[in-house]
Amino acid sequence: MQIDRRALLGGLAAAVAVPPHLFAATITDATGRTVTSPDHVARVYPAGPPAAVTLYTLAPDLLLGWVEPPGEKEREFLLPEIAARPALPRITGRGDTDLNGITSLKPDLILDIGTVTAAYSSLAARVQTQTGIPYALLDGHLDRVGATYRALGQLLGRVEAAEKLASTAENTIALIMQRSAAVPPEKRPRVYYARDNSGLQTGLGGSMISEPIEFIGARNVAADLHGAHGTATLDQIRAWDPEIIITSNKDFAASVAGNPDWAAIAAVKAGRVHLAPNLPFGWVDYPPAVNRLIGLWWLAKIFYPESFPQDIKTLTRDFYTLFYHVTPSAAQVERVLTGRD
């Protein structure tokens, strides 16, 4: 693995070389709130995992720490200095967030990325009022990745770097969407997404959990069960009879072929159960951030192989180089793609 230290050192150099007043910016975040960054942003607190991942891809030097610190296997694909940063408490709306602990870290900005709802908007406003720290909530949906990067780039004074990531994301999405849209409806597979070791927890229609699957036009068999996530029954899954099963659980992936309860389902009979890669972050649903962009390529090649001849190994290497600031070896890419670590 080659480490792109320019991503870290370049950010540090920019912070020193650019006059501080050039960093100040005011944006309208995804909730419609006006957020003004301070004159100099050097420490950013991520409210949750999507914010941490997105901030890492753009400005790793500014990341104070991780709500869910990467483990040993994940750290292999991240900048060592940043991956080793400490655990931070998640900011929630349940009243159990230690705001004094957050302010003691002296962040210049609190960043949240994800679903934009009235509850999250209220949380952002309340935390900003109580701490005096600017709090930006940006949209985490795939079709908003470019806009989110550009807004974040403005806040951080990293406009050029943000534009590179935004353009790459938008061009990738446009290409995948264009080719997916050309697939006739009758050739769009029925897909079931299994999230746990029982295979019964799934992503429901319109949720961020199942967003990548639905985004490229596959038919999520659980789409009529609206919400975030839920539990299906075996009888429901048998009735849906998915042609493809995508799973993020390695135990389920390893056991389903030998499980008689699943034997009659089309995807199992055809050997079309696919374990999603998860290093350093999940490729399909968690955390729901830009890490799912490479997952779109992976899913598209599974769903529509004739329309997507691109080499997934090359795509993986290039994505990790640009977004994670490391260039994995061929052996590392192979290990990522097996999804079994």
Feature roles, as predicted:
Residues A7-A24:
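N-terminal export signals
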Residues A30, L88-N100, L225-L234:
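Short helix-initiation/N-cap motifs at beta->coil->alpha
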Residues A51-S104, L109-A118:
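A short, structured surface patch at a secondary-structure boundary
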Residues V116-T129, S248-A264:
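A ligand-binding cleft/hinge motif common to bilobed small-molecule-binding domains
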Residues A223, H229-D251:
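Ligand-binding pocket segment of bilobal, Venus flytrap-like solute-binding proteins
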